[in-house]
Amino acid sequence: MPRVKAAQAGRQGPAKRRLAEHFAAGEIITDMNKKEWKLGSPIGQGGFGCIYLADMNSSKSVGNDAPCVVKVEPSDNGPLFTELKFYQRAAKPEQIQKWIRTHKLKYLGVPKYWGSGLHDKNGKSYRFMIIDRFGSDLQKIYEANAKRFSRKTVLQLSLRILDILEYIHEHEYVHGDIKASNLLLSYKNPDQVYLVDYGLAYRYCPEGTHKEYKEDPKRCHDGTVEFTSIDAHNGVAPSRRGDLEILGYCMIQWLSGHLPWEDNLKDPNYVRDSKIRYRENIASLMDKCFPEKNKPDEIAKYMETVKLLDYVEKPLYQKLRDILLQGLKAIGSKDDGKLDLTVVENGSLKAKPVAKKRKKEAEESVESSVEDMECSDKQTEEATQTRSKTRKRVQK
């Protein structure tokens, strides 16, 4: 699902970035707090950086079961810098643990930031950041599962994503690019999901002062076009209501298998106009996406609630969770923390069974796809084009 590229007609793309050279397994790097980390095998390379397995330095080599990864890029590049600012401000382990404790959560799907710094090699400087290791992304599982998730799975995922969004919003940031490929399963617990890729994260409320609503034609359609908010289509900086709107579109796609505007994603104005039209008539959106019986009324109610939010208004997150919890109750289920990612049904709507081979591929990807965190050249280059523009507006 490509993002809208920053380089529109008449505008130049980002300057070409230097690539990070490969580091040998066993190389030691020291973060800003003087903690030493040992690199393991490389598990991915993007257009500007590399990702390695990593663990705290010891006499042992870093095995394939390493708990962390390190992202490395030349220090004069920018994509990792923008993401690093979010992690330093909002993702320290003690911050996350305090939130989990005070909000009585079982976990919070925000990657923990373990350290960062600069590392010199062969006369060149490299920036690095250490975060948790993860498993497969939801997009791979969604596609392997006939492009359907069960109603229970969609509601369970969305409840956990609401927990994540409430946390990052309370820490002055919005994500701006929620989608299945940015949602990774825990490396060891397939019932835990984490929101990653904060390259579009925007500090919407620095020092408690919310940014003003302002349309900027140069920033129209930021994000991933099929999911991005109407505000983003209009060139407005991301806000809390935008994140919640994006989640609504994700829920509809995960459950129905499609969004009404997916037939013309090359025309972002068409996508924007379709979203505006359906926002005015949520019932027609539900009829379009769910022509069968057993429509998910909770998703319609969620969308109706979100569309009433003002740009600077603080959402009532628990109200939104309660709406989704009612949806679980309506199908005879409850919030048991189980994602059930292999079940595919929606009332009377049932997808074709997933072939055993495809199921096996999805299961194997859980163990081996840490590279989903920006590792393919194509994904990284697309992200870079958007981030080159976004980087200028992220608060330093």
UniProtKB/Swiss-Prot annotation:
On this chain, the residues bearing Phosphoserine are: S376
Alphabetized GO MF terms: ATP binding; histone H2AX kinase activity; nucleosomal DNA binding; protein serine kinase activity; protein serine/threonine kinase activity
What EC number(s) does the entry state? Answer: 2.7.11.1
Can the keyword Phosphoprotein be found in this entry's annotation? Answer: yes
What PROSITE patterns does the record point to?
PROTEIN_KINASE_ATP (PS00107), PROTEIN_KINASE_DOM (PS50011), PROTEIN_KINASE_ST (PS00108)
Summarize the activity regulation: Active in presence of Mn(2+), Mg(2+) and Zn(2+), but is not functional with Ca(2+) or Cu(2+). Has a higher affinity for Mn(2+) than for Mg(2+). RAN inhibits its autophosphorylation and its ability to phosphorylate histone H3.
Catalysed reaction(s)? L-seryl-[protein] + ATP = O-phospho-L-seryl-[protein] + ADP + H(+); L-threonyl-[protein] + ATP = O-phospho-L-threonyl-[protein] + ADP + H(+)
**PTM comment, free text:** Autophosphorylated at various serine and threonine residues. Autophosphorylation does not impair its ability to phosphorylate p53/TP53. Phosphorylation by PLK3 leads to induction of Golgi fragmentation during mitosis.
> GO cellular component terms?
Cajal body; chromatin; cytoplasm; Golgi stack; nucleus
Q: Does the keyword DNA repair apply?
A: no
The Protein kinase domain covers: 37-317
Q: Where does ATP bind?
A: I43, G44, Q45, G46, G47, F48, G49, C50, I51, K71
Where is this protein localized, as stated in its record? Answer: Nucleus; Cytoplasm; Nucleus, Cajal body
UniProt cross-link Glycyl lysine isopeptide (Lys-Gly) (interchain with G-Cter in SUMO2), position: K71
Query: Do you know which SMART domains this protein is assigned to?
Result: S_TKc
Q: Give the main localization category.
A: nucleus
UniProt region (Disordered), positions on chain: 352-396
**Which residue positions are annotated as catalytic?**
D177
- Complex formation: Interacts with HDAC1, KAT2B, SETDB1, KDM3A and KDM4A. Associates with the nucleosome through interactions with nucleosome DNA, histone H2A and histone H2B; the interaction with H2A and H2B is mediated by the nucleosome acidic patch, a cluster of negatively charged residues of H2A and H2B forming a cleft within the nucleosome core.
Q: Would you identify the family this protein belongs to, as annotated?
A: Belongs to the protein kinase superfamily. CK1 Ser/Thr protein kinase family. VRK subfamily.
- Provide the function of this protein: Serine/threonine kinase involved in the regulation of key cellular processes including the cell cycle, nuclear condensation, transcription regulation, and DNA damage response. Controls chromatin organization and remodeling by mediating phosphorylation of histone H3 on 'Thr-4' and histone H2AX (H2aXT4ph). It also phosphorylates KAT5 in response to DNA damage, promoting KAT5 association with chromatin and histone acetyltransferase activity. Is involved in the regulation of cell cycle progression of neural progenitors, and is required for proper cortical neuronal migration.
Q: Protein name, please?
A: Serine/threonine-protein kinase VRK1
Q: What organism is the protein native to?
A: Bos taurus (Bovine)
What is the gene called?
A: VRK1
